[in-house]
Amino acid sequence: MIGLIGIRKNTPLEIREKFIVKSKKYNEYFGELLKELNEVVILATCNRTEIYFNASLNEEELLKKIFDIFNWDYEYKKYVFITNNKDAYRHLFEVCSGFHSKILGEDQILGQVKDAYEEALEFKAVSLELHRLFQEAITCGKRFRKEAKLFEIPVSSSSIVVSEAIKRECTKFMVLGYGEVGQLVMKYLLSHKIQTVYLVVRNPKIKDEIQDERVKVITFEEKNKYINSIECIISCTSAPHPVVKTEDISESGSRLVIYDLSVPRDVEKEVALLSRTEVYNIDTISRIDDENKKLRKDKMEDNRHIMNKYLKEYDEWLKLRSISHVIKNLKTVGNDVYEKRVQTFSHKSKDKNDIALAHKLIKSTSDFYINRAIEVIKEETLKGCGEEWIGIIEKIFMTKE
């Protein structure tokens, strides 16, 4: 049975923190888990804790063992969900396609799932069923994003402002601040064909980290030398006061687009009154964000059929795998019948040509009926009637002579 144990989505942060998975203890975790489970993958990120497994234990017994291995307090069991079979692997396909991410359709989770799968491979914790499941889910996630073209709809403030600036044909930029948001802004900017970015920072040593000739790292004291030569400012500092003021900007000149991603604001209110400026603050950007989230959600639902196709294929593969022993037995029976019939004929005929012909005819006849029986079992298994038909076919073909 393929199953999944995970932390519920609405679990408060202070409770989520109690479900710690320590990366340094993976060797110990996998060692203990594989004593109880046939296969296991640990997916642990800052927003997600999920254990995928292949086992035959009952749910209560399984939960207790998992809690013991990870040293979790069983008192918090109510914050955990457990599901199995199709619901479990549907969840993984949805995770890889971005349906369960805080930012719908984001790419990061796909890399995290891939890392978790490769980690399990290193510890020899996956074999056939989870191996196939994770390969299919990762492939599905890649194809889903590509065909749904989610990249066309940015849903984070940093990606939105870059997208909006590029639409306005800006090519010369100034980015103020190089914290988490600033780094994302730079990443998105440098993925486009822009001309120049003046990166304004307090620590000029940051220039050693950036290997791109389009980037000029400058200090806040130097920013006013270049501020009137650019077309767009993106400000994302943590300063408690404005860092872009009216006196910094010349009243004459071409249009200047300014995006202020900071709270409190980086850009002085009066800057918006200048005739050449267009100023957008975090509230304006958030409205674009809300619209984009709805657009992205609609687009993802429109393309859910891509995920459902992979889900169906895996489900069918799993069902057919469950009857592999029956197929193997049928082929063995067919081969036994063929060999016995050929042996009987060989004793009755001395003509080598006749014996060779008999070999071919008996083999082809045996293969025809066995293969047809296998086709019927596969068809009926996928319809959900496999057990009944396996019983009938075994009665026909596997009766002792």
UniProtKB/Swiss-Prot annotation:
The record marks H91 as: Important for activity. The active site is at C46. It catalyses: (S)-4-amino-5-oxopentanoate + tRNA(Glu) + NADP(+) = L-glutamyl-tRNA(Glu) + NADPH + H(+). Substrate binds at T45, C46, N47, R48, S101, E106, D107, Q108, Q112. GO terms for molecular function: glutamyl-tRNA reductase activity; NADP binding. Keywords: NADP, Oxidoreductase, Porphyrin biosynthesis. NADP(+) binds at G177, Y178, G179, E180, V181, G182. InterPro entries: 4pyrrol_synth_GluRdtase (IPR000343), 4pyrrol_synth_GluRdtase_dimer (IPR015896), 4pyrrol_synth_GluRdtase_N (IPR015895), GluRdtase_CS (IPR018214), GluRdtase_N_sf (IPR036343), NAD(P)-bd_dom_sf (IPR036291), Shikm_DH/Glu-tRNA_Rdtase (IPR006151). Gene3D superfamilies: Glutamyl-tRNA reductase, N-terminal domain, NAD(P)-binding Rossmann-like Domain. Pathway: Porphyrin-containing compound metabolism; protoporphyrin-IX biosynthesis; 5-aminolevulinate from L-glutamyl-tRNA(Glu): step 1/2. Its EC number is 1.2.1.70. The keyword Disulfide bond does not apply. Homodimer. Catalyzes the NADPH-dependent reduction of glutamyl-tRNA(Glu) to glutamate 1-semialdehyde (GSA). This is Glutamyl-tRNA reductase. The gene is hemA.
